[in-house]
Every structure is written in structure tokens, then in C-alpha cells.
UniProtKB/Swiss-Prot annotation:
This protein's encoding gene: rplK
Native species: Lactococcus lactis subsp. lactis (strain IL1403) (Streptococcus lactis)
Keyword Signal attached: no
Function noted in UniProt: Forms part of the ribosomal stalk which helps the ribosome interact with GTP-bound translation factors.
CDD domains for this protein: Ribosomal_L11
InterPro entries, alphabetized: Ribosomal_uL11, Ribosomal_uL11_bac-typ, Ribosomal_uL11_C, Ribosomal_uL11_C_sf, Ribosomal_uL11_N, Ribosomal_uL11_N_sf
Gene Ontology CC terms: cytosolic large ribosomal subunit
Quaternary structure and partners: Part of the ribosomal stalk of the 50S ribosomal subunit. Interacts with L10 and the large rRNA to form the base of the stalk. L10 forms an elongated spine to which L12 dimers bind in a sequential fashion forming a multimeric L10(L12)X complex.
One matching Pfam family: Ribosomal_L11
Keywords: Methylation, Ribonucleoprotein, Ribosomal protein, RNA-binding, rRNA-binding
Single Gene Ontology BP annotation: translation
The name this protein goes by in its record: Large ribosomal subunit protein uL11
């Protein structure tokens, strides 16, 4: 008999820095997962992406075992890194805080392709451009 998924837990954790402290510990503790087992495995799997925020979807089964899938970093995090800023604009329509090039947007779109609901790189680029504009970034050629 196949294991039944009892709960899905979605978290965003810095790569290689998962600890049993909040928010990881309480979220997994409620689901009955071995927290240390998860943190060790997550840190080992994401050690090469240090400095990035990694979204993770943890499937908890009825016997309290788990599997997890790591996703690509959020577009906003990648855009901030490309533009070299700490945060986006509080008023994106009025105040522009940084600019990104089409080449940087294409690079981010290609990296995010597996997680985006887009059929082509051009469609993915327009999605990333929309995120950039909503953060107060200007897009230059």
C-alpha cells in the first residue's frame, strides 16, 4: 500500500542555513517531522546556493516520514541580487530604486523556467519584467 500524504508544508529558507529554530522548527514540529533530519538534508542539498532564499515544499506522509522538493529562488530575490539593492521601492510607480537590463532579466527567466508557468523564455521574461516593475525597478536594453 502506498504512503498517503498527510500534510504539505511550504517554507522559504536561506540555502544551507536551516535550523530547528523558528520558522522551520514549529512548522515541522506540528506536522510531526524529524526536524534535525530535515535540516541536515536541506542544508546538504542547498549548500551550493549559499546566500539565496530557497522555497521548499515538504510532503509529510501518514507514517511521519517526509520528502521535499526545492524550487528556484523567488524572482524578487534574484532581481534584488542582479540590481545590487537590499529592497524594492515602497512606491514603485513614483520612486524607482534601481535598473536591470534585458540580459539580466533573460538570465533570471532561464533560471526560473522550471518553476514558472510559461511555455517560452519570452513569456517568462515578461513575467520577470512585471515583477521588476512592481518592485520599482526600471528595465533597460
Amino acid at each position: 500500500m502506498a504512503k498517503q500524504v498527510e500534510k504539505l508544508v511550504k517554507l522559504q529558507i536561506p540555502a544551507g542555513k536551516a535550523t530547528p529554530a523558528p520558522p522551520v522548527g514549529p512548522a515541522l514540529g506540528q506536522a510531526g517531522v524529524n526536524i534535525m533530519g530535515f535540516t541536515k538534508e536541506f542544508n546538504a542539498r542547498t549548500a551550493d546556493q549559499a546566500g539565496m532564499i530557497i522555497p521548499v515544499v515538504i510532503s509529510v506522509y501518514d507514517d511521519k516520514s517526509f520528502t521535499f522538493i526545492t524550487k528556484t529562488p523567488p524572482a524578487a530575490v534574484l532581481l534584488k541580487k542582479a540590481a545590487g539593492v537590499q529592497k524594492g521601492s515602497g512606491e514603485p510607480n513614483k520612486t524607482k530604486v534601481a535598473s536591470v537590463t534585458k540580459a539580466q532579466i533573460k538570465e533570471i527567466a532561464e533560471l526560473k523556467m522550471p518553476d514558472l508557468n510559461a511555455s517560452s523564455v519570452e513569456t517568462a521574461m515578461s513575467m520577470i519584467e512585471g515583477t521588476a516593475k512592481s518592485m520599482g525597478f526600471t528595465v533597460t536594453d
